[in-house]
C-alpha cells in the first residue's frame, strides 16, 4: 500500500506510523522473533494509546497480527491486549470517520470501474468488508467485489517450492477479475493484489497497477 496515499487522505481529514508486525517471521514459524517484534512495537505504540490515539494499520496482514495473532501468542501481556483493542485497519478507520463525522467534501468520480479484492487477512479480522464500504463513498463508482483467496499467502507465493501452488490457487480469482473488465483492481493486501495482477496480465484486461483501496480514495480526492 502506498503510505503517501494513506497520509494524503488522513491529512484531508485533519488526522495525523513503529516496526514490522512480524508476519514474515510467523510464516516461517519463528515464533520467538514474532514475540520480540510484538514486545518491541507494542511498547512503542502504547505510548500513543496512553495519550488517547488509535493505531491504524495500512495492510490487512499487519492489522491481523496486531489484533489477533499477537494476543494469541502473548495472552497474558496487558499491553499487547490493549493494543489489539485500539487497532483499526485503514479502511475500517476511514469508515469510522465517515460514520461518525462524515468525510471532508471533495470526493469526485474516477475514470473507470474498480474490482476490489477482499483479502483473506481482512476477512479474518471479522470487521466486514470495509474496503467495499469505503469505495462506495465515491460518487457513481462502478464497483465489483471479489472474495476469494489470491493464493499468495505471504511468503508462500514467492518461495520456489510453493509458487506454482500459489498460482493454481489464485487462477480462479484472477479469472474473475478479468471477467469484471474494470480499469482498476484494488486489494487491502498489497501482495495479494500484485499476485492477482501478475496472473491476469496475459489478457491485459487489468490495465493499471494493482493498488490499495485507499489509493482509489486518494485519486478520487485528486491528491
Q: What are the functions of these language-model segments?
A:
Residues 33-95:
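Phosphate/diphosphate-binding loops
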Residues 120-131:
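Active-site glycine- and acidic-residue-rich loops that bind
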Residues 77-106, 147-153, 204-223:
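Short, flexible loop segments at boundaries between secondary-structure elements
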Residues 1-10:
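Single conserved hydrophobic/aromatic residue that forms the stacking wall/gate
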Residues 157-213:
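C-terminal structured "cap/appendage" subdomains that terminate the fold
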Residues 11-17, 47-52, 139-148, 173-184:
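Immediate flanking context of iron-sulfur cluster ligation sites
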Residues 11-37, 64, 92-95, 141-163, ...:
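Short connector loops at secondary-structure junctions
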Amino acid at each position: 500500500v502506498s503510505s503517501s496515499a494513506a497520509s494524503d487522505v488522513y491529512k484531508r481529514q485533519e488526522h495525523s506510523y513503529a516496526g514490522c508486525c512480524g508476519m514474515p517471521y510467523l510464516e516461517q514459524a519463528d515464533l520467538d522473533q514474532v514475540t520480540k517484534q510484538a514486545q518491541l512495537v507494542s511498547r512503542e505504540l502504547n505510548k500513543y494509546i496512553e495519550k488517547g490515539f488509535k493505531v491504524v494499520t495500512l495492510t490487512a496482514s499487519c492489522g491481523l497480527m496486531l489484533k489477533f495473532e499477537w494476543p494469541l501468542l502473548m495472552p497474558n501481556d496487558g499491553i499487547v491486549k490493549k493494543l489489539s483493542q485500539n487497532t483499526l485497519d485503514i479502511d475500517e478507520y476511514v469508515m469510522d470517520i465517515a460514520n461518525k463525522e462524515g468525510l471532508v467534501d471533495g470526493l469526485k468520480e474516477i475514470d473507470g470501474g474498480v474490482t476490489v479484492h477482499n483479502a483473506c487477512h481482512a476477512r479474518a479480522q471479522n470487521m466486514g468488508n470495509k474496503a467495499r464500504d469505503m469505495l462506495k463513498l465515491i460518487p457513481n463508482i462502478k464497483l465489483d467485489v471479489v472474495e476469494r483467496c489470491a493464493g499468495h499467502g505471504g511468503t508462500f507465493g514467492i518461495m520456489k517450492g510453493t509458487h506454482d501452488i500459489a498460482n493454481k490457487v489464485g487462477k480462479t480469482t484472477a479469472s474473475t477479475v478479468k471477467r469484471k473488465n474494470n480499469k482498476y483492481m484494488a486489494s487491502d493486501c498489497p501482495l495479494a493484489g500484485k499476485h492477482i495482477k501478475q496472473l491476469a496480465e496475459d489478457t491485459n484486461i487489468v490495465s493499471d497497477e494493482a493498488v490499495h483501496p485507499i489509493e482509489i480514495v486518494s485519486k478520487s480526492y485528486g491528491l
